[in-house]
Amino acid sequence: MNPIISAASVIAAGLAVGLASIGPGVGQGTAAGQAVEGIARQPEAEGKIRGTLLLSLAFMEALTIYGLVVALALLFANPFV
Protein backbone atom coordinates (compact mmCIF):
# COMPACT_ATOMS: atom_id res chain seq x y z
CA MET A 1 0.00 0.00 0.00
CA ASN A 2 1.28 3.42 -0.93
CA PRO A 3 2.04 5.43 2.24
CA ILE A 4 0.94 8.69 0.63
CA ILE A 5 -2.49 7.24 -0.15
CA SER A 6 -2.74 5.86 3.39
CA ALA A 7 -1.86 9.22 4.93
CA ALA A 8 -4.26 11.07 2.65
CA SER A 9 -7.04 8.62 3.53
CA VAL A 10 -6.54 9.15 7.26
CA ILE A 11 -6.51 12.94 6.83
CA ALA A 12 -9.60 12.79 4.62
CA ALA A 13 -11.39 10.60 7.17
CA GLY A 14 -10.66 13.11 9.92
CA LEU A 15 -11.85 15.98 7.76
CA ALA A 16 -15.00 14.08 6.79
CA VAL A 17 -16.04 13.60 10.39
CA GLY A 18 -14.95 17.07 11.49
CA LEU A 19 -16.56 19.03 8.69
CA ALA A 20 -19.68 16.87 8.65
CA SER A 21 -20.31 17.66 12.31
CA ILE A 22 -19.90 21.45 12.17
CA GLY A 23 -23.10 22.26 10.30
CA PRO A 24 -25.41 19.91 12.20
CA GLY A 25 -23.88 21.02 15.49
CA VAL A 26 -24.65 24.66 14.77
CA GLY A 27 -28.09 23.75 13.45
CA GLN A 28 -28.96 21.66 16.48
CA GLY A 29 -27.92 24.41 18.84
CA THR A 30 -29.99 26.97 16.96
CA ALA A 31 -33.01 24.67 16.76
CA ALA A 32 -32.86 23.85 20.47
CA GLY A 33 -32.56 27.53 21.37
CA GLN A 34 -35.51 28.47 19.20
CA ALA A 35 -37.56 25.60 20.66
CA VAL A 36 -36.88 26.76 24.21
CA GLU A 37 -37.82 30.29 23.20
CA GLY A 38 -41.03 29.05 21.57
CA ILE A 39 -41.99 26.99 24.61
CA ALA A 40 -41.32 30.00 26.86
CA ARG A 41 -43.67 32.12 24.73
CA GLN A 42 -46.40 29.49 24.33
CA PRO A 43 -46.24 26.83 27.05
CA GLU A 44 -49.44 25.21 25.77
CA ALA A 45 -47.70 24.28 22.50
CA GLU A 46 -44.90 22.42 24.26
CA GLY A 47 -45.81 18.94 22.98
CA LYS A 48 -46.05 20.00 19.36
CA ILE A 49 -42.82 22.01 19.51
CA ARG A 50 -40.96 19.17 21.21
CA GLY A 51 -42.12 16.62 18.64
CA THR A 52 -41.09 18.82 15.74
CA LEU A 53 -37.76 19.55 17.43
CA LEU A 54 -36.93 15.88 17.97
CA LEU A 55 -37.76 15.02 14.37
CA SER A 56 -35.61 17.84 13.01
CA LEU A 57 -32.74 16.93 15.36
CA ALA A 58 -32.83 13.37 14.03
CA PHE A 59 -32.58 14.63 10.45
CA MET A 60 -29.67 16.89 11.37
CA GLU A 61 -27.87 14.07 13.16
CA ALA A 62 -28.20 11.90 10.05
CA LEU A 63 -25.83 14.27 8.23
CA THR A 64 -23.16 13.66 10.85
CA ILE A 65 -23.67 9.91 10.59
CA TYR A 66 -23.18 10.12 6.81
CA GLY A 67 -19.83 11.80 7.41
CA LEU A 68 -18.89 9.01 9.81
CA VAL A 69 -19.82 6.39 7.20
CA VAL A 70 -17.61 8.11 4.63
CA ALA A 71 -14.74 8.21 7.12
CA LEU A 72 -15.12 4.53 7.96
CA ALA A 73 -15.21 3.66 4.27
CA LEU A 74 -11.98 5.59 3.73
CA LEU A 75 -10.29 3.87 6.66
CA PHE A 76 -11.41 0.26 6.25
CA ALA A 77 -12.69 -0.17 2.68
CA ASN A 78 -10.41 2.27 0.93
CA PRO A 79 -11.37 2.46 -2.76
CA PHE A 80 -8.05 4.10 -3.68
CA VAL A 81 -5.87 1.10 -2.85
Curated annotation (Swiss-Prot):
Biological role: F(1)F(0) ATP synthase produces ATP from ADP in the presence of a proton or sodium gradient. F-type ATPases consist of two structural domains, F(1) containing the extramembraneous catalytic core and F(0) containing the membrane proton channel, linked together by a central stalk and a peripheral stalk. During catalysis, ATP synthesis in the catalytic domain of F(1) is coupled via a rotary mechanism of the central stalk subunits to proton translocation. Key component of the F(0) channel; it plays a direct role in translocation across the membrane. A homomeric c-ring of between 10-14 subunits forms the central stalk rotor element with the F(1) delta and epsilon subunits.
* Entry-linked InterPro entries: ATP_synth_csu_bac/chlpt (IPR005953), ATP_synth_F0_csu (IPR000454), ATP_synth_F0_csu_DDCD_BS (IPR020537), ATP_synth_F0_csu_sf (IPR038662), ATPase_proteolipid_c-like_dom (IPR002379), F/V-ATP_Csub_sf (IPR035921)
Location(s), subcellular: Plastid, Chloroplast thylakoid membrane
Q: How does it assemble?
A: F-type ATPases have 2 components, F(1) - the catalytic core - and F(0) - the membrane proton channel. F(1) has five subunits: alpha(3), beta(3), gamma(1), delta(1), epsilon(1). F(0) has four main subunits: a(1), b(1), b'(1) and c(10-14). The alpha and beta chains form an alternating ring which encloses part of the gamma chain. F(1) is attached to F(0) by a central stalk formed by the gamma and epsilon chains, while a peripheral stalk is formed by the delta, b and b' chains.
Add the further remark from the entry: In plastids the F-type ATPase is also known as CF(1)CF(0).
Principal localization reads plastid
Species assigned in the record: Glycine max (Soybean)
- CDD domains registered for this protein in UniProt: ATP-synt_Fo_c_ATPH (cd18183)
List the molecular function annotations (GO) for this entry. Answer: lipid binding; proton-transporting ATP synthase activity, rotational mechanism
Question: What's a Pfam family in this record?
Answer: ATP-synt_C
Report the transmembrane regions from the record. Answer: 3-23, 57-77
Q: What is this protein called?
A: ATP synthase subunit c, chloroplastic
What NCBIfam families does the database record attribute to this sequence? ATP_synt_c, PRK07354.1
What family does the database annotate? Belongs to the ATPase C chain family.
Note the coiled coil stretches, chain numbering: none
Q: For this UniProt record, give its keywords in alphabetical order, as a comma-separated list.
A: ATP synthesis, CF(0), Chloroplast, Hydrogen ion transport, Ion transport, Lipid-binding, Membrane, Plastid, Thylakoid, Transmembrane, Transmembrane helix, Transport
Record membrane topology: Multi-pass membrane protein
Q: Provide GO CC annotations from the record.
A: chloroplast thylakoid membrane; proton-transporting ATP synthase complex; proton-transporting two-sector ATPase complex, proton-transporting domain
